[in-house]
């Protein structure tokens, strides 16, 4: 499968110039309202002050896997919108942490073969631990920033972070499925960016920001900007190291 991949750092834009149309979010996922100011959350990669302020408004986790950011409008500019497919991944930082992953997704990037093993990749903060109250037992998954079904990336260490089972399947997957279904049905492109958000020097991301906008129809088909929490109900996580323990109320 031939791919065009851009290299180099990805720069965030300041604000979306054109508002997206209304989009129904994945079923069984309710949006959260901003209930108060959160501490500033830093990220690996280049980020504007305006964008950081937007993320600072994300409320603390409260029983929903994601929160809507910036009124659900992604921070893409008109110059970002293109019908040329590409993928771009940030270099790992000195702590081995992933940065921003961005792509203009099209049918030509989607996989034509089954996924290969990714077990050899150990993302920052990786721990192998099981809990009986976690679906599949394992607390952590190797979470693709840009899902395999969208770009066919296998053991790409620049695209895999330590993420909870809950974030992977309840938070990220419904949005990935929505984008994949749209591309298959229309043949259109979707501009897509996922930013892992690390607090200070933590090795495990507190969450990921997912942004997407369909290109040919200017966001009428796909348009979202959400923050997905890297949490697991019933489990306490030390984001500095990846270590964890069951909450007392679940014992």
Language-model features: locations:
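C-terminal motif of bacterial Sec signal peptides marking the signal peptidase cleavage site
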Residues: 16-19
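Cross-kingdom leucine-rich repeat
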Residues: 10-14
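Domain-level detector of nuclease and nuclease-like folds
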Residues: 78-251
């Amino acid at each position: 499968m031939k791919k065009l991949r851009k290299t180099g750092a990805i720069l965030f834009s300041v604000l979306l110039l054109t508002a997206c149309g209304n989009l129904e979010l994945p079923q069984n996922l309710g949006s959260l309202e901003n209930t108060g100011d959160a501490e500033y959350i830093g990220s690996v990669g280049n980020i504007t002050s305006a964008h950081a302020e937007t993320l600072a408004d994300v409320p603390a986790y409260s029983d929903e896997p994601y929160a809507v950011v910036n009124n659900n409008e992604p921070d893409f500019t008109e110059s970002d919108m293109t019908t040329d497919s590409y993928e771009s991944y940030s270099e790992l930082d000195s702590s081995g942490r992933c940065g921003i992953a961005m792509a203009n997704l099209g049918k030509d990037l989607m996989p034509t073969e089954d996924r290969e093993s990714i077990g050899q990749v150990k993302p920052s903060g990786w721990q192998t631990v099981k809990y009986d109250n976690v679906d599949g037992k394992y607390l952590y998954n190797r979470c693709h920033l840009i899902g395999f079904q969208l770009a066919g990336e296998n053991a790409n260490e620049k695209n895999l972070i330590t993420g909870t089972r809950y974030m992977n399947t309840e938070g990220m997957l419904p949005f990935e499925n929505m984008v994949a279904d749209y591309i298959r049905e229309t043949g259109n492109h979707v501009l897509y960016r996922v930013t892992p958000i690390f607090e200070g020097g933590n090795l495990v991301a507190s969450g990921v920001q997912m942004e997407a906008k369909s290109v040919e129809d200017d966001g009428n088909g796909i348009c979202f900007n959400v923050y997905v929490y890297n949490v697991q109900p019933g489990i306490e996580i030390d984001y500095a190291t990846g270590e964890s323990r069951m909450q007392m109320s679940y014992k």
